[in-house]
């Protein structure tokens, strides 16, 4: 099964992805983690990624799709993938559909985690302090939310036309959100 965890920065995609990996054995394909790893590696690609992320902007489709494509064989072997932070644009969604179709599979479900903006900012500022994430200043967080609503939120209609979107309240405890996701995945 291939699922997309969808929602604004700080809604809990990473936390819930890790939980699904532990419970179901699927592979987490977190573009945020992959991009932070590339950044930390200090390669030419990592330096380009750092400059883009530090400005609160989206990394190019070509870079992100290349990172995802490299991990698809691992996901197939595990029986499924959780796409966390990908796709972020309609072009990326179309590319993902094609990548999966070429491998005889598809996105089975899109879980939209719903959290209000002020809660998102509070969560991200706290995470930045706890984890030392230089890309999570309050100004950059607000810019990331603007980018999300302008460029990524329009994906909801793209996947809704395919009948794949299931909204889950992301404002509860981690366990409550996990229960909401589990219920959504059982829906047909």
Swiss-Prot record:
Enzyme's top EC category: transferase
Keyword ATP-binding attached: yes
Region (LID): 126-136
This protein's UniProt keywords: ATP-binding, Cytoplasm, Kinase, Nucleotide biosynthesis, Nucleotide-binding, Transferase
InterPro entries: Adenylat/UMP-CMP_kin, Adenylat_kinase_CS, P-loop_NTPase
Residues annotated as binding ATP: 10-15, 127, 172
Binding site for AMP: 31, 36, 57-59, 85-88, 92, 133, 144
Gene Ontology BP term (one): AMP salvage
Cited CDD domains: ADK (cd01428)
Molecular functions per Gene Ontology: adenylate kinase activity; ATP binding
Region spans: NMP: 30-59
GO CC aspect terms: cytoplasm
Family according to the record: Belongs to the adenylate kinase family.
Domain notes: Consists of three domains, a large central CORE domain and two small peripheral domains, NMPbind and LID, which undergo movements during catalysis. The LID domain closes over the site of phosphoryl transfer upon ATP binding. Assembling and dissambling the active center during each catalytic cycle provides an effective means to prevent ATP hydrolysis.
Name recorded for this polypeptide: Adenylate kinase
Protein species of origin: Maricaulis maris (strain MCS10)
Encoding gene per record: adk
């Amino acid at each position: 099964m291939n699922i997309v965890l969808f929602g604004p920065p700080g809604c809990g995609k990473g936390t819930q992805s890790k939980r699904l990996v532990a419970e179901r054995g699927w592979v987490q394909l977190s573009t945020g983690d992959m991009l932070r790893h590339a950044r930390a590696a200090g390669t030419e690609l990592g330096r380009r990624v750092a400059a883009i992320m530090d400005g609160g902007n989206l990394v190019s489709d070509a870079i992100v799709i290349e990172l995802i494509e490299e991990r698809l064989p691992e996901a197939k072997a595990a029986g499924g993938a959780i796409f966390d932070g990908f796709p972020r644009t309609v072009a990326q969604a179309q590319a993902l559909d094609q990548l999966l179709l070429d491998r005889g599979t598809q996105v089975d479900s899109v879980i939209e985690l719903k959290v209000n903006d002020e809660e998102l900012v509070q969560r991200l500022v706290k995470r930045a302090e706890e984890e030392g994430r230089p890309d999570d200043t309050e100004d950059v967080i607000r810019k990331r939310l603007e980018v999300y609503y302008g460029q990524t939120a329009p994906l909801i209609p793209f996947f809704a036309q395919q009948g794949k979107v299931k909204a889950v309240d992301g404002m509860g405890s981690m366990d409550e959100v996990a229960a909401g996701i589990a219920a959504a995945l059982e829906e047909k």
